[in-house]
Amino acid sequence: MKTLLLTLVVVTIVCLDLGYTRKCLNTPLPLIYTTCPIGQDKCVKMTIKKLPSKYDVIRGCIDICPKSSADVEVLCCDTNKCNK
């Protein structure tokens, strides 16, 4: 009986996937990340090209990945902390 109850609990947790949300980096440091709000299930890294200085990088969560342009390179991904 205990085995059946334990099996049901494990199956319930696996099926419900309790508390899962995407985690994305929001700084260049790999240990600092943010938990994305509901609906924002992609991580993004935007590189803004400024001359003559180097690139400014924006990282975080996003719902829809925008297209890259001549001034902004956009990289989107679908796994945790993938926007390095």
UniProtKB/Swiss-Prot annotation:
The answer to keyword Signal applying to this record is yes
- The highest taxon in the source lineage is Eukaryota
Which residues are connected by disulfide bridges in this protein?
C24-C43, C36-C61, C65-C76, C77-C82
Cited InterPro entries: Cytotoxin_Cobra (IPR003572), Snake_3FTx (IPR003571), Snake_toxin-like_sf (IPR045860), Snake_toxin_con_site (IPR018354), Toxin_cobra-type (IPR054131)
Query: Which tissues and organs express this gene's product?
Result: Expressed by the venom gland.
Q: Where is the signal peptide?
A: 1-21
Q: Which GO terms describe its molecular function?
A: toxin activity
Q: Where in the cell is it found?
A: Secreted
Q: What is its main location?
A: secreted
Q: Tell me, what does this protein do in biology?
A: Acts as a beta-blocker by binding to beta-1 and beta-2 adrenergic receptors (ADRB1 and ADRB2). It dose-dependently decreases the heart rate (bradycardia), whereas conventional cardiotoxins increases it. At 100 mg/kg, intraperitoneal injection into mice provokes labored breathing, impaired locomotion, lack of response to external stimuli, and death (after 30 minutes).
Q: Which family does the UniProt entry place this protein in?
A: Belongs to the three-finger toxin family. Short-chain subfamily. Aminergic toxin sub-subfamily.
State the remark under miscellaneous: Negative results: does not affect blood coagulation and does not show significant hemolytic activity.
Give the protein name, as stated in the record.
Answer: Beta-cardiotoxin CTX27
Taxonomic source organism = Ophiophagus hannah (King cobra)
Q: What is the lineage of its organism?
A: Eukaryota, Metazoa, Chordata, Craniata, Vertebrata
